[in-house]
Curated annotation (Swiss-Prot):
DNA damage listed as a keyword: yes
Name listed for the protein in its UniProt record: Actin-related protein 4
Signal peptide: none
Residue span of region Disordered: 104-136
Locations listed in the record: Nucleus
GO annotation, biological process: chromatin remodeling; DNA repair; regulation of transcription by RNA polymerase II
Superkingdom of source: Eukaryota
Pfam family, any one: Actin
Subunit structure: Component of the NuA4 histone acetyltransferase complex, of the INO80 chromatin remodeling complex, and of the SWR1 chromatin remodeling complex.
Biased composition (Acidic residues): 119-136
The encoding gene: arp-4
Amino acid sequence: MSHQQPLSSSVQPTDIYGGDEVSALVLDPGYCNTRAGYAGEEMPKQVLPSFYGHINGRDVFGDEYIVPKPGFEVRNYMNRDSVVEDWDAATRMWEHVLVKRLQPERSTPPSKKGINISDDGDVPMEDDGNNNEDATDALEKPLAENPLLMTEAPWNSPKAREKAIEISMETWGVPAFWLSKTPVLAAFAAGKATALVIDVGGANTSVTAIHDGMVLKRSIQRSPVGGVWLSSQICKMWDGSEPKVDVVPRFMVESKKPVEAGAPAEANLRKFNFDIHPSFRAYEEERVLTEFKESVVEVWRGPQRFTTPGNEDAVRTQPGRVFEMPDGSNQMWREQRFKVSEGMWDETAAYNSTDEEGRVTKAQTIPALIKAALEGVDVDLRPNILGNVVVTGSTSLLNGFNDRLNHELAQMYPGVKIKIHAAGLTTERRFGAWIGGSILASLGTFHQMWISRKEYDENGAGIVEKRCK
């Protein structure tokens, strides 16, 4: 397979191959969000939560439909390893975002426009009983004009890879398909064909070495220390606070009054005449935790660890940050906002957790992942790879993250020239893999790489293992 070269930073995709001429779609499914859009564009047009609602035997997609209702359950089609667990739900979710959201004019045949759309905005699990093949052809093969590039985790299984091309070719009728690993695409988005990609996402953190546009398989490292893990650390911190901090999700608050910092909330809570499903409550609590992460949590920049004597006392004298809960209660956070993220770097600093998911070992910390990844790389390649460290993923947007990473790398590899490439824009850091896919799929030189329908018909789903390395 020929190696895929990224664009230089001075060349835009549309300069090489007009974006409006390309009907290729790029789909980047993740544990927290699913991103989709057209190749050649700078950002995904659609970003939907990978969490979806399930009520009365039907699935509903889109954040606007995740609202409190009797029996309303929140599910995710992926597991915490960022691998698809429920293929039926994944297929429906992807089709919803690729057709209904991206190309609404093609999502329903003219004969049925406006007829079968429910007020829940859902995609029913069953068809509506119309067996007229001609009338439903547009629904059966909704992507017959769109080549599709899909992203995958570097540890994705061969079975899952074959399932992805099967759905794309058989169910959606795509004319061409490609499957690309997220670290390769994140490197391409940064203009690199060789890099060490550190992806700190919602469900996990991975470190992968890329050489000439190919994943070095022995380098692949991952750990559950990502955004969801950080949320569990915040919950531990709140539980141990004086006074204890209770998470009251926004949907439960009817009205509130301003109160002093540390004072009890004065809020009227909504009363529901049905039980709220625990999965819905957890999903809504995660929204509050995400706000706290984005506005309060910070990474200790170094050069020493946060636990080094004197550091915590020094932070206590600095201005803190106030966070207001949805119920109006608020509190000033100083040293705690650094301590809560320190377990990502130093396992001894993590809040103790009784559940296995919340625990962190030394091998799961970011420095240990980097060390293990580079040990899987030929010694001669290491300097070049360390000179191109690409940081991506939403959790890498924590204040101070890049400074700390720089200090850790400098301590681990003294004398080696280290350069970190981290997009300054929030959207570019969150959508690194999607942007790389958009660049790749819009290249005129990439057209020879696509797996065509003819190749698929001749070789079956196994072609994806041979072609998409």
